[in-house]
Swiss-Prot record:
Residues 46-81, 133-142, 193-201, 309-323, 375-384, 439-445 are extracellular. SUPFAM superfamilies: MFS general substrate transporter. Expressed in skeletal and cardiac muscles. Expressed in brown and white adipose tissues. CDD domains: MFS_GLUT_Class1. Insulin-regulated facilitative glucose transporter, which plays a key role in removal of glucose from circulation. Response to insulin is regulated by its intracellular localization: in the absence of insulin, it is efficiently retained intracellularly within storage compartments in muscle and fat cells. Upon insulin stimulation, translocates from these compartments to the cell surface where it transports glucose from the extracellular milieu into the cell. Residues 1-24, 103-111, 164-171, 223-287, 345-353, 406-417, 467-509 are cytoplasmic. Gene3D superfamilies: MFS general substrate transporter like domains. D-glucose binds at residues 177, 298-299, 304, 333, 396, 404. Keywords: Cell membrane, Cytoplasm, Glycoprotein, Lipoprotein, Membrane, Palmitate, Phosphoprotein, Sugar transport, Transmembrane, Transmembrane helix, Transport, Ubl conjugation. This is Solute carrier family 2, facilitated glucose transporter member 4. One of its GO terms (cellular component) is cytoplasm. The modification Phosphoserine is found at residues 10, 274, 488. Glycans are attached at residue 57.
Length: 509
């Protein structure tokens, strides 16, 4: 009997449709609740910027005492705000190095459960910051929720990738990004002044992140652990068999279990690499460079600058209701993530990434032109909105969801944990740089700031075109062959791969 974890060809050569069980749906939904929180905390800090800055001003004045200045120095306020935004990424940078250790020690499911302690604590601190008259507490809360998000950014794709059926591997993997953008959109809507973006309710707006954390704590115990973790890492055949049965809906999972046994045998022959060994390995240097550059192409594209400071950008463009325009960008973000879900297994990772980079570069140039002409041509404010919407749409077609797919597929089991740590650290470091530095760069460059991103996007496009292989439909042996300078393997007939190969071993390097 075919298992839900295999892709067994039918008589006409077409792969069969595999069952999507209720357990699989519950497990994926429960996992991506973490990604929803990740996105929420990216977007939530934008809309209430003015009222939070007013709170910072009141706190600062209260500490000066009578006879002090009548307002906080602008430089101090800018620094406090930039730190409030960027400390989120510092937490992510630090925790991203712990993904491999925690996922191996606790398992995928229990690691996600334990991670919610950071979410609850961070949300509580942010919610209490105003009452405590302490911007330090808010910044600490942002740090903790960033640490939560750093772990989530690795744990969720790992878990979903290991439980996904083959024919849905790409689509279910992209749901991680979809949950992130939905979280951003929810934060933007709730951040409106007519909702929670007021001087009295903004602490509640920041604290709401506790709710999906509690929901995940409630649902995850009913979900199975990754069968790959149970058998290959923990050597627990009975629990792995039970997990496979729940996920696939089949009574006989012997084929899937045999697949796990074969993978375990290969893993025993492949030496895991430490971080230092990976960095010093000539064999893995090229795929590691590709993995890092693709992460840079995501974060240095300018997308986080748009979401962190979108309200300010729309105000600069002369939009009368910038908060609503920001929500419009969030809707576009969500819609085009759905488009990526539909296209990722059809068009290919490399093609979508190139399309996204090219489109974002064009929109960045258009945005610059619109901002420069705004004073002479007021209608340019509408052009700037179109440019931002297009910028967001092209991001979600390619640079948003694609880089993590490539990282997972470029490396076999031995170097993969270290490679994901390097890629994750690169991603979060750039996130921090943009969050901390964009406001200063924007003040210095004015309307020309997005030309800087256009130049970077062009460079990433050229690199992707010249160096990044297409990985869709190819086995890890074929992908690895491109880095051994034997491209002839890529011309061979592509054999079906399985979702367990998504994070499984391929060869003994």
């Amino acid at each position: 009997m075919p298992s839900g974890f295999q892709q067994i060809g039918s008589e006409d050569g077409e792969p069969p449709q595999q069952r999507v069980t209720g357990t699989l749906v519950l497990a994926v939904f429960s996992a991506v609740l973490g990604s929803l929180q990740f996105g929420y905390n990216i977007g939530v800090i934008n809309a209430p910027q003015k009222v939070i800055e007013q709170s910072y001003n009141a706190t600062w004045l209260g500490r000066q005492g009578p006879g002090g200045p009548d307002s906080i120095p602008q430089g101090t306020l800018t620094t406090l705000w930039a730190l409030s935004v960027a400390i989120f990424s510092v937490g992510g940078m630090i925790s991203s190095f712990l993904i491999g250790i925690i996922s191996q020690w606790l398992g995928r499911k229990r690691a996600m459960l334990a991670n919610n302690v950071l979410a609850v604590l961070g949300g509580a601190l942010m919610g209490l910051a105003n009452a405590a008259a302490s911007y330090e507490i808010l910044i600490l809360g942002r740090f903790l929720i960033g640490a939560y998000s750093g772990l989530t950014s690795g744990l969720v794709p790992m878990y979903v990738g290991e439980i996904a059926p083959t024919h849905l591997r790409g689509a279910l993997g992209t749901l991680n990004q979809l949950a992130i953008v939905i979280g951003i959109l929810v934060a933007q809507v709730l951040g409106l002044e007519s909702m929670l973006g007021t001087a009295t309710l903004w602490p509640l707006l920041l604290a709401i992140t506790v709710l999906p954390a509690l929901l995940q704590l409630l649902l995850l115990p009913f979900c199975p652990e990754s069968p790959r973790y149970l058998y290959i890492i923990r050597n627990l055949e009975g629990p792995a068999r039970k997990s496979l049965k729940r996920l696939t809906g089949w009574a006989d999972v012997s084929d899937a279990l045999a697949e796990l046994k074969d993978e375990k045998r290969k893993l025993e022959r492949e030496r895991p690499l430490s971080l230092l060994q990976l960095l010093g390995s000539r064999t893995h240097r090229q795929p590691l460079i590709i993995a890092v550059v693709l992460q840079l192409s995501q974060q240095l594209s300018g997308i986080n600058a748009v979401f962190y400071y979108s309200t300010s950008i729309f105000e600069l463009a002369g939009v009368e209701q910038p908060a609503y325009a920001t929500i419009g960008a969030g809707v576009v973000n969500t819609v085009f993530t759905l488009v990526s879900v539909l296209l990722v297994e059809r068009a290919g990772r490399r093609t979508l990434h190139l399309l996204g980079l090219a489109g974002m570069c064009g929109c960045a140039i258009l945005m610059t032109v619109a901002l420069l002409l705004l004073e002479r041509v007021p209608s340019m404010s509408y052009v700037s909105i179109v440019a931002i919407f297009g910028f967001v749409a092209f991001f979600e077609i390619g640079p948003g969801p694609i880089p993590w797919f490539i990282v997972a597929e470029l490396f076999s089991q031995g170097p993969r944990p270290a490679a994901m740590a390097v890629a994750g650290f690169s991603n979060w470091t750039c996130n921090f740089i943009v969050g901390m530095g964009f406001q200063y760069v924007a003040d210095a460059m004015g309307p020309y700031v997005f030309l800087l991103f256009a130049v970077l996007l062009l460079g990433f496009f050229i690199f992707t075109f010249l160096r990044v292989p297409e990985t869709r439909g190819r086995t890890f042996d074929q992908i690895s062959a491109t880095f051994r300078r034997t491209p002839s393997l890529l011309e061979q007939e592509v054999k079906p791969s399985t979702e367990l190969e998504y994070l499984g071993p391929d060869e003994n390097d």
